[in-house]
C-alpha cells in the first residue's frame, strides 16, 4: 500500500494536496471548542494542516505512510520555522500510539494525551481490521473530552468508504457523535465530516 502512495506523490497525482486547510478545521479552531494544546494529524500528507495548527499555537504530531510526503512536509515545516512545534513521522496510523505518546504516557512527549485529532481522507482507505486497530489506538492517545474530526467518503460498490452505521459501531461507546455534515466532492461522490468527542469515562 505504501508504494501506491509513493507513486502518487512522485507523479503529483495528489488532488487532495491543495495547500489549503479545510474551512471545517479552521472553524473548529477559531470556535474555541478546542483548547490550544496538542494535536494529532493522521494522514498528514505534506503538512499543510499541521503547519496551520502550529501557527495557531498547537504542538503537533503528523503521521503519514508516504516517505515522499513526509519529506516534503519536513521541508515546509523548516521553511515556516516551526520545527520546534511540529513532529512528523513516517509510519502506519494504526500505530499512532507509538508516535504520539511513546511506549507509556510517562515517556510521552505529550504527557496526558492529545487534545485534538483529525483525519482528512486516511481512515476511509483502511480495511476493516485496520480501522478497528486505528480506533483502539486513537482512544488510547486522546484525552477525555478531546475532539476528533474525520472527513471520509461514503462507500461505493467498487470503492472503500465509511458509512454512518460503521462510525456508530466502531466508535461507540468511547465517543459521542457531536456533529455530522454531509457533502460531495467535485465528482459528486458522497462524503461527510464527522465530529466526535471522546467520553470522559473512556
Describe each PLM feature range.
Residues 115:
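Conserved acidic residues
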Amino acid at each position: 500500500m505504501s508504494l501506491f502512495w509513493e507513486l502518487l506523490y512522485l507523479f503529483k497525482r495528489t488532488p487532495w494536496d491543495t495547500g489549503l486547510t479545510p474551512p471545517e478545521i479552521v472553524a473548529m479552531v477559531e470556535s474555541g471548542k478546542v483548547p490550544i494544546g496538542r494535536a494529532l494529524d493522521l494522514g498528514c500528507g505534506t503538512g499543510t494542516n499541521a503547519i496551520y495548527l502550529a501557527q495557531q499555537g498547537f504542538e503537533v504530531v503528523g503521521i503519514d505512510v508516504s516517505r515522499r510526503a513526509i519529506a516534503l512536509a519536513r521541508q515546509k515545516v523548516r521553511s515556516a520555522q516551526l520545527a520546534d512545534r511540529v513532529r512528523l513521522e513516517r509510519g502506519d496510523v494504526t500505530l499512532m500510539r507509538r508516535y504520539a505518546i511513546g511506549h507509556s504516557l510517562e515517556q510521552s512527549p505529550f504527557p496526558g494525551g492529545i487534545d485534538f485529532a483529525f483525519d482528512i481522507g486516511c481512515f476511509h482507505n483502511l480495511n476493516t481490521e485496520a480501522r478497528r486497530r486505528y480506533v483502539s489506538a486513537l482512544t488510547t492517545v486522546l484525552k477525555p473530552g478531546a475532539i476528533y474530526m474525520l472527513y471520509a467518503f461514503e462507500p461505493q460498490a467498487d470503492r472503500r468508504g465509511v458509512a454512518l452505521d460503521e462510525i456508530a459501531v466502531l466508535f461507540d461507546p468511547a465517543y459521542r457523535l457531536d456533529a455530522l455534515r454531509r457533502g460531495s466532492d467535485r465528482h459528486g461522490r458522497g462524503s461527510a465530516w464527522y465530529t466526535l468527542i471522546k467520553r470522559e469515562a473512556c
